[in-house]
Amino acid sequence: EHARIASEVAHRNGLEFHAWMPCMLHKGLPSSWYAVNRKGERADSVQAYVPYYTCLDPNNKDVQAYLIDKYKRVAALPSVDYVQLDYIRYPDVILAKGLWSKYNLVMNEEYPTADYCYCDDCVAEFKAKTGIDIRSVQDPSKVKAWAQFRCDVITNFVNKLCAEIHAMGKKVSADVFPGPKSHAVWMVRQEWNK
């Protein structure tokens, strides 16, 4: 209802309307939908850094179906021009240096509490693709294929969602992680150039 009202006001004033919605941050959904950190903790019960980092597992097919339906319902509103994806990424495995003092952190490595997603499905899919059991690796941050796997999960979901929204004649915009592409890949597993 809020998107409908705001989009109508925007159009009356000659503006485009981008319906901004956080993508991967949600509360109150089935526990099996949440990403799992390297310690085996689900993001609905233990969050890295801040309580709102209740991050969904972007590789979970039920999560994908839920989000696609949610975005399509908003895109179906006649006066919505764009759906805008925010938090279309994993939580920060490394926080930006400017935030270290705020949280009393020294981020000199990828810490298990902030490193997602180690759910059974992601681990099994990665092992099937690479032969690597990522849970048995002493330092998963050194396995570039593991970081790339998670980047690909985000990219593949965005492409799937965009195809659905574009088929409705609507557009998609996104809030992407700031800074060089290499920081987005390293810190939040997002390849916004793809």
Set out the residue ranges of the language-model regions:
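Aromatic-lined substrate-binding rim segments of carbohydrate-active enzymes
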Residues: 1-29, 149-168
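Residue-level marker for beta-strand->alpha-helix junctions and adjacent short loops that shape enzyme
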Residues: 22-24, 90, 179
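Substrate-binding cleft/loops of secretory-pathway carbohydrate-active enzymes
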Residues: 93, 171-194
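Active-site-adjacent "subsite" loops/lids of carbohydrate-active enzymes
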Residues: 3, 8, 18-78, 135-139
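Active-site-proximal loop/short-helix segments
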Residues: 33, 80, 84-142, 181, ...
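Hydrophobic faces of well-ordered beta-strands that scaffold small-molecule active sites
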Residues: 17-19, 83-86, 172-174
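Surface-exposed cleft-lining segments at the edges of enzyme active sites
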Residues: 57, 133-153
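Conserved, mostly hydrophobic/aromatic
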Residues: 67, 74, 83-86, 165
